[in-house]
């Protein structure tokens, strides 16, 4: 085996609340724990919030998701440190740019061996996604997929050569095969039949269909209780607050199932998670998207020896084959109820399914997965040492979504200096705001466009105050009598004698149009459309 002096993982990382963050953290620790490893194992973490996260010392470099320059710096960091191999965690929504294309700029600049783990593989990608994937396959020395379905799609849809592909399953904790009753008293549910779904909450999870199935389940099994474990996904919470969870809670009350559905709205650590999984009699993944090539929650549940009821998304079809679980059609509450009732009523069959699932997943425990990755890294390093990636090779993989120009990070300090609680001042003396010139409607409309675009790129909540200020100015600028926007306001907040004109009016409408498209909150959009 070729010795690897350092291994770098690129992706999001714990304590960020995301399935891939958990995966990246787990694979780093699993590899570092292998007895033959004396390598320097570290991570390059991707941040989706401006202030980042309180990472462990394992994280040596941070990339701001929307800042292209950070990707170039990350490549330089990896090159300068002469890492033995880079393992990239890829999902389209993880990186900035069109369909996550910012990561390509880093990879084209990278001069180290690259293994890419694909957490999403689409059979019908958009044009942008297809372009990103094709460049990713060229720039990577090997591609890892977490299921046979992913390998088949890469071969058939993207034309990737078989020898470039490796299947390494999603890692899982190595847990004992235990009776669910062992953990139930800890959660106050002893003597009950426990159904469980865990993971970060979002509308694609399909949990509403299990809730709709609960009355039928309870009619046959009055002691059944359904636990929904997990906080709302941070991105969902930023964009729509707790709308999905609140809708689920309303459905529970409308069905009178308050005594049979428990919400645990929190992100639990691994030890507590495994105790929750341990107490489940039936684990349910009612996901709505068929094109899901991997599910970490499904792997965890099966690896703990759970009887699973799932919708037939790709990973579930593969994992639950050979009677290792039960499938129910998408969006079908009656079918879910039938499958759950069957398992709860047939203890012998339920335990047989549990055992088949548990035995099948022994190859997926983290120590084994870590060994699989180390063997792959060794093979890649050995092959790469004879033909290292040149700068020209990286440039040859360039496509239409990114170019090689490094743009500076957008700096809003001067815009903020020119903005007071009324709006954006028209002019300045050198860099100092000139109050004698007052405020212009057209300028505030343009500022609304800039701040809206900046928020979309960075999700920096500090920009929201600017958006509110410019939107408020435009609302005040509208003259109902003429049906036009007034063009100028003096510094004393009185409108100038200049009559409304069509130029200011058209630019204001342009700004409000962008406001409707880019404003993050419904209240802002509602005001912009008035």
Regions found by a protein language model. Give the residues of each.
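A short helix/loop element that forms part of the nucleotide-sugar donor recognition site in Leloir-type
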Residues: 177-189, 194
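Carbohydrate-associated surface elements
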Residues: 149, 171, 232
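Conserved donor-binding/catalytic core segment of Leloir-type glycosyltransferases
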Residues: 9, 189-205, 211-214, 227
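Nucleotide-activated donor-binding/catalytic signature segment of Leloir-type glycosyltransferases, i.e.
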Residues: 239-267, 271, 422
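Short hydrophobic beta-strand element within catalytic cores of glycosyltransferases
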Residues: 302-303, 307-310
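Conserved acidic donor-binding segment of nucleotide-sugar-dependent glycosyltransferases
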Residues: 322, 326-333, 342-347
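Low-complexity, Ser/Thr/Pro/Gly-enriched N-terminal "stalk/linker" regions
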Residues: 390-443, 457-489
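A short, well-ordered alpha-helix in the C-terminal region of glycosyltransferases
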Residues: 342, 349-363
């Amino acid at each position: 085996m070729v010795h690897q002096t350092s291994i770098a993982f690129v992706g999001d990382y714990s304590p960020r609340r995301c399935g891939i963050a958990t995966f990246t953290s787990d694979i780093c620790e699993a590899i570092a724990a292998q007895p033959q490893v004396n390598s320097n194992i570290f991570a390059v973490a991707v941040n989706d919030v401006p202030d980042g996260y309180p990472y462990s010392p394992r994280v040596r470099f941070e990339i701001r998701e929307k800042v292209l320059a950070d990707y170039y710096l990350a490549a330089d960091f990896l090159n300068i440190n002469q890492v033995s191999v880079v393992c990239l965690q890829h999902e389209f929504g993880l990186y900035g740019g069109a369909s996550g294309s910012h990561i390509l700029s880093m990879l084209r600049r990278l001069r180290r061996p690259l293994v890419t783990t694909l957490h999403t593989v689409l059979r019908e990608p958009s044009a942008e996604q297809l372009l990103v994937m094709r460049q990713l396959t060229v720039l990577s020395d090997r591609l890892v997929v977490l299921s046979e379905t992913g390998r088949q799609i890469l071969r058939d849809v993207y034309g990737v050569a078989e020898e470039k592909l490796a299947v390494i399953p999603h890692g899982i904790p190595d847990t004992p095969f235990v009776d669910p009753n062992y953990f139930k008293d800890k959660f106050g549910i002893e003597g009950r039949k426990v159904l469980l779904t865990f993971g970060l909450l979002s509308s694609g999870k399909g949990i509403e269909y299990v809730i709709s199935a609960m009355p039928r389940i309870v009619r046959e099994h009055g002691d059944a209780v359904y636990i929904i474990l997990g906080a709302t996904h941070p991105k969902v919470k930023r964009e729509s607050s707790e709308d999905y969870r609140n809708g689920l809670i309303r459905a529970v009350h409308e069905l009178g199932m308050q005594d049979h559905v428990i919400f645990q709205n929190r992100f639990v650590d691994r030890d507590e998670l495994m105790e929750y999984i341990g107490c489940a009699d039936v684990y349910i993944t009612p996901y709505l998207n068929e094109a899901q090539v991997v599910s970490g929650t499904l792997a965890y549940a099966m690896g703990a020896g759970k009887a699973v009821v799932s919708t037939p998304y790709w990973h579930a079809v593969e994992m639950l084959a050979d009677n290792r679980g039960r499938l129910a059609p998408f969006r079908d509450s009656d079918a879910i109820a039938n499958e759950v009732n069957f398992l709860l009523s047939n203890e012998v069959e339920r335990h047989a399914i549990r055992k088949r699932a548990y035995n099948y997943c022994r190859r997926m425990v983290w120590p084994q997965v870590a060994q699989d990755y180390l063997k792959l890294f060794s093979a890649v390093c050995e092959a790469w040492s004879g033909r290292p990636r040149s700068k020209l090779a990286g440039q040859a993989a360039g496509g239409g979504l990114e170019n090689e120009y490094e743009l500076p990070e957008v700096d809003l300090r001067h815009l903020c200096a020119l903005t007071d609680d009324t709006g954006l001042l028209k002019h300045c003396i050198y860099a100092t705001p000139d109050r004698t010139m007052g405020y212009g409607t057209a300028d505030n409309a343009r500022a609304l466009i800039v701040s809206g675009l900046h928020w979309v790129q960075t999700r920096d909540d500090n920009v929201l105050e600017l958006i509110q200020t410019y939107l408020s100015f435009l609302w005040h600028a509208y003259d109902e009598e003429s049906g036009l926007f007034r063009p100028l306001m003096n510094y004393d907040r009185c409108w100038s004698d200049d009559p409304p004109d069509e130029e200011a009016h058209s630019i204001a409408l342009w700004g409000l149009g962008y406001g409707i498209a880019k404003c993050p909150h419904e209240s802002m959009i509602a005001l912009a459309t008035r």
